[in-house]
Amino acid sequence: MKHSHEEIRKIIPEMRRVQQIHFIGIGGAGMSGIAEILLNEGYQISGSDIADGVVTQRLAQAGAKIYIGHAEEHIKGASVVVVSSAIKDDNPELVASKQKRIPVIQRAQMLAEIMRFRHGIAVAGTHGKTTTTAMISMIYTQAKLDPTFVNGGLVKSAGKNAHLGASRYLIAEADESDASFLHLQPMVSVVTNMEPDHMDTYEGDFEKMKATYVKFLHNLPFYGLAVMCADDPVLMELVPKVGRQVITYGFSEQADYRIEDYEQTGFQGHYTVICPNNERINVLLNVPGKHNALNATAALAVAKEEGIANEAILEALADFQGAGRRFDQLGEFIRPNGKVRLVDDYGHHPTEVDVTIKAAREGWGDKRIVMIFQPHRYSRTRDLFDDFVQVLSLVDALIMLDVYAAGEAPIVGADSKSLCRSIRNLGKVDPILVSDTSQLGDVLDQIIQDGDLILAQGAGSVSKISRGLAESWKN
């Protein structure tokens, strides 16, 4: 669906003077989704990124003007410039925008403008945001409500991470990493869990992070709804401070939407949800792990509270194929030592890695798990070093890639070599450090056994590396 510029006056009336919107870092998951929505609303979109890829190519095909690399002349004609939090202050396009007094806003500020005239559902939390956002989006789509959605990862069944719908509903992932979710004014807010992460934003103070989440929930109108996980002790500690209606979900006896009798067969989960009115709903999921049951129950709770029929909820959840890079099965391959399965997963925080390993163990029985792990950011590796040592010791074989810096400078003692040394000292697994990823296939062939599940784990380039591996193994 594409609108003329005249029609935009009706959609976002306050933005009628805006003609061209320029995105610095347009290839990022959150940025590209918003760019796609605005492109389909009829705005002229331009954007730049350091590398070309599937996302930038798709935007170019849809009509966006894409530049690879950053240069001052790229902002020509822009009415407003949108920046991702990854963009440094000395970026030439950002510097030029400020010199020319072109308004520069954060990604979340633009998302807030899109949400302003819609019924917004925002999903926040340390883990599970992308999957939960995708599940809610698919339920509303199944219910023929044609929602707009903007997600931080690919919604597999839609084949994209953003969609412009015709209805008033907007479902969006809310980003706490730079506290920019405070710009959003939703009608429903979901918080999946809360753990220390992105602590540089919160000056290393977890109490400040908690207070920021409460502030986010108070952006709800007095008639709004907060949906929170009852299994998370930090969230339950915050509930008395939230001056809005709160509905809870989880395995906890105290949950309003309570999960019972969870079982996993292979990579399929099934369980029962006891609703606040004691209605029992049997759920089937084709994505593994208790963490996905929690994500699905958050989505179910939102849908039930908003009056969506059970049939649409259950069909959408049963059909849900996952979000991009969340336990993404790349295939089974015959190698010299036998048949193996390769899975790509985005989890890069110790808790996420832990639940992925548990889901794999449940579905893969007594077979071995071989992990290819790429730490993401030196600061996260430093802050959660001991937790990484413990969780990475849970696999049967471990290949460690160098830290994916994500623009950070190296930190002494927070590199892959230090992580390998500490894991080896714990004595449960002997990690292999592979700095030259062109050697990865050869190293794997030396250690894999028949029936192994290979988990490529991390938020950096490990996904591209594992997909390249899958392509080479097909030939």
Curated annotation (Swiss-Prot):
It catalyses: UDP-N-acetyl-alpha-D-muramate + L-alanine + ATP = UDP-N-acetyl-alpha-D-muramoyl-L-alanine + ADP + phosphate + H(+). It is found in: Cytoplasm. GO terms for biological process: cell division; cell wall organization; peptidoglycan biosynthetic process; regulation of cell shape. Pfam families: Mur_ligase (PF01225), Mur_ligase_C (PF02875), Mur_ligase_M (PF08245). InterPro entries: Mur-like_cat_sf (IPR036565), Mur_ligase_C (IPR004101), Mur_ligase_C_dom_sf (IPR036615), Mur_ligase_cen (IPR013221), Mur_ligase_N (IPR000713), MurCDEF_pg_biosynth (IPR050061), UDP-N-AcMur_Ala_ligase_MurC (IPR005758). Keywords: ATP-binding, Cell cycle, Cell division, Cell shape, Cell wall biogenesis/degradation, Cytoplasm, Ligase, Nucleotide-binding, Peptidoglycan synthesis. Its main location: cytoplasm. ATP binds at residues 125-131. Its EC number is 6.3.2.8. The keyword tRNA-binding does not apply. One of its GO terms (cellular component) is cytoplasm. Pathway: Cell wall biogenesis; peptidoglycan biosynthesis. GO terms for molecular function: ATP binding; UDP-N-acetylmuramate-L-alanine ligase activity. Cell wall formation. PANTHER family: UDP-N-ACETYLMURAMATE--L-ALANINE LIGASE, UDP-N-ACETYLMURAMATE--L-ALANINE LIGASE-RELATED. Belongs to the MurCDEF family. This is UDP-N-acetylmuramate--L-alanine ligase. It comes from Haemophilus influenzae (strain 86-028NP).
